[in-house]
UniProtKB/Swiss-Prot annotation:
Keywords (A to Z) from UniProt: Cell membrane, Disulfide bond, Glycoprotein, Ion transport, Membrane, Phosphoprotein, Sodium, Sodium transport, Symport, Transmembrane, Transmembrane helix, Transport
Subunit note: Interacts via its C-terminal region with NHERF4. Interacts with NHERF1. Interacts with TMEM174; regulates SLC34A1 internalization by PTH and FGF23.
Disulfide links within the chain: 228-525, 309-339
BP terms from Gene Ontology: cellular response to phosphate starvation; intracellular phosphate ion homeostasis; phosphate ion homeostasis; phosphate ion transport; sodium-dependent phosphate transport
Protein name as catalogued: Sodium-dependent phosphate transport protein 2A
Tissue spec: Expressed in the kidney cortex.
Species in which this protein is naturally found: Oryctolagus cuniculus
GO molecular function: sodium:phosphate symporter activity
Pfam hit, one: Na_Pi_cotrans
Amino acid sequence: MISYGEQLSSPAVSPPLVRAGLRGPMMHGATFAYVPSPQALHRIPGTSAYAFPSLSPVALTEHGCPYGEARERHEPLPAKLALEEEQKPESGWAQELRRTAMTLLKLPLMVTFLYLFVCSLDVLSSAFQLAGGKVAGDIFKDNAILANPVAGLVVGILVTVLVQSSSTATSIIVSMVSSGLLEVSSAIPIIMGSNIGTSVTNTIVALMQAGDRTDFRRAFAGATVHDCFNWLSVLVLLPLEAATGYLHHVTGLVVASFNIRGGRDAPDLLKTITEPFTKLIIQLDRSVITSIATGDESLRNHSLIRIWCHRDPVEASTSMARAETNISRTHGNATMEKCNHIFVDTQLPDLAVGLILLAGSLVLLCTCLILLVKMLNSLLKGQVAKVIQKVINTDLPAPFTWVTGYFAMVVGAAMTFIVQSSSVFTSAITPLVGLGVISIERAYPLTLGSNIGTTTTAILAALASPREKLSSSFQIALCHFFFNISGILLWYPLPCTRLPIRMAKALGKRTAKYRWFAVLYLLVCFLLLPSLVFGISMAGWRAMVGVGAPFGALLAFVVLINVLQSRSPGRLPKWLQTWDFLPHWMHSLQPLDHLITHATLCCSRSEPRSPQLPARVFLEELPPATPSPRLALPAHHNATRL
């Protein structure tokens, strides 16, 4: 029988046996092998403790097996949790009772933090509207600019990012169409832009999981799959709409075919729960933004902060001037009283109040999200996590496997209809994607269903319009609905067409390696690039074609070369099989990463090695019966003897 020591690359020397006063025969076993303890393993530079299914610590080093990918491939749970579970002694009934009580205590705390998380999103939206609501109204007011489809798309993105609410942006568009200030055909690109702008919220939420690279990679991929779907859909459907008027004609036929009657407002299911808390912080009069957008300058100097409210909550509230200081007053047949929120008597301008609320809501959002992730990480581990992962990510049995994704879309649409906000739903599932509970392949159809769910809310809201405005309002809501349906038909039915998943995974890997790339992505995709396109579109369509055509051709060439380099490099010339002929900064983010690292005074990515420790540690092959892999370490290292 081959001893353990003979299988090591460098033979281990057994220490001399200390003969004590023992009676009876002494048995000499095989040569001792060194297995580092978890404490010693953490002191080895460049290694990371990882648990295989046998829960034995193994050092994954520079031998071509990235730690994050290997951990996700073998075990979805963090190695630290698995090691803690292995080292935890068996508990009695008292410890079991204490653990159960702690679990029951965490559940109401999780519900509380989730409630505060949703409320912080509502306050965040109000903060953005205070800071940039009137600017958004001014942007909508220039009809000559909105007649350009590309400019209309950019306006939709910027306005939705400014007010952090696609519902507010859509209501402004519906009001402008209803009043005759904007044609339906000109409003369709703005609807597309608002669909892109609303996806910025869950991308911001994903930034809160930047502490762990593996979680951040999954969370950012799960958040940006929404962005990728919206951008790809716009790249196909916007030129199609500009050339043929596809959405305008289809929705016009639907409106003309049905005898549509006005209905009730969309149900406020989530707001009924959150408004008692958010109304104590701030209350806004959003009609000011709509009035500015429709050309009514009488409310130009009015504040968005609501001062006077109706006593009857069913009636619409009317905003009064801040100069009134009475506790109650009569307006027509309605008795009004002063609103009850923190900023009701403030003398600060709207911008200052908006910045205060922006900072406070971001702090509350980050705190709630971090605590939620920690509690989910403690609850969803071991067998519980495996069961939940299996239930959520498992497909239906054959031959109905293909139905699973569409069923997830129905679930996403229903949940979004209940909470009345796609941002809230997608922001809620983003931490679960980061923890690995929901796979990105399952998060993708849930997000598509969320897109559909938010359009059904807009349709119900359009049905509440007056009869003379019903037709145009309903047509705009249907344009939003058919835009998302068309995008699903383009990018979901066939597995080969699900490009948003592959694009999101590539973005996730990039941000896990360079975490500053996530902030750069947000600034470029939702602010700098739309602003640049908007500025070029102001110069006319000739400037758009002159700048956009060469840039589009260059982008298409780079994408084509990248695909050929990864799949069939032999078809390319030798000098084009890699991008090494270009300067390093043109095909790699490492120079920029080095610059940003030094500019922010961050520590270097590589840890200094001790001269007493080896540069590399390699795994050794073990017989199948051995429960714990071993490392070839020098004899002077502290190790646990087996």
